């Protein structure tokens, strides 16, 4: 399992929580952004800096995330692409995006975008607080536990364990144990 983070607008507290989860689970967390982002120094955390163009980080995540991974993003359009690829995705407030709720979320996003474009709604984002961090941490724990259970079931069926671990150079290697 790889934890993918759309790091361009990800709160620092969320980055720390993801880094701790990656260390606890022994997996890799890839923070993808089109500019350098400060990270927790850990062999489990990898910064992926894309070209400094719009949507480059999103395209990278879409191209490399796989079933069994978890993506963290607040970008609804990216979340829809990830859900459509049958990959688990949550936002930085702990909301889990699914096939059942992503269309509604995208519709609300588009409606609010239109209202803001017409000057009928202010551009506001509530500050990220302790409750948000706790809710995110709970959601992250639930989703990673679910993904680990699914991976164990697949391993039991195939008899092979797939793992993704960081090498000494900090790059990820995939192999069989």
From Swiss-Prot:
Superkingdom field: Bacteria
Chain segments carrying region Disordered: 155-177
Family the entry assigns: Belongs to the UPF0178 family.
Name of the featured protein: UPF0178 protein TP_0845
Species whose genome carries this gene: Treponema pallidum (strain Nichols)
């Amino acid at each position: 399992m790889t934890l993918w983070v759309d790091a361009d607008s990800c709160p620092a507290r969320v980055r720390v929580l993801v880094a701790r989860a990656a260390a606890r689970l022994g997996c890799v967390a890839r923070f993808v952004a089109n500019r350098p982002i400060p990270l927790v120094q850990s062999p489990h955390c990898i910064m992926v800096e894309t070209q400094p163009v719009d949507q480059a980080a999103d395209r990278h995540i879409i191209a490399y995330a796989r079933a069994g991974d978890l993506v963290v993003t607040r970008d609804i359009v990216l979340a829809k692409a990830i859900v459509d690829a049958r990959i688990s995705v949550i936002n930085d407030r702990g909301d889990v995006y699914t096939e059942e709720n992503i269309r509604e979320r995208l519709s609300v996003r588009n409606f609010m975008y239109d209202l803001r474009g017409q000057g009928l709604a202010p551009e506001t984002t509530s500050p990220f607080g302790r409750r948000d961090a706790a809710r995110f941490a709970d959601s992250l724990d639930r989703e990673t536990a679910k993904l680990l259970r699914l991976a164990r079931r697949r391993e039991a069926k195939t008899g092979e364990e797939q793992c993704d671990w960081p090498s000494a150079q900090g790059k990820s290697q995939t192999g069989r144990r």
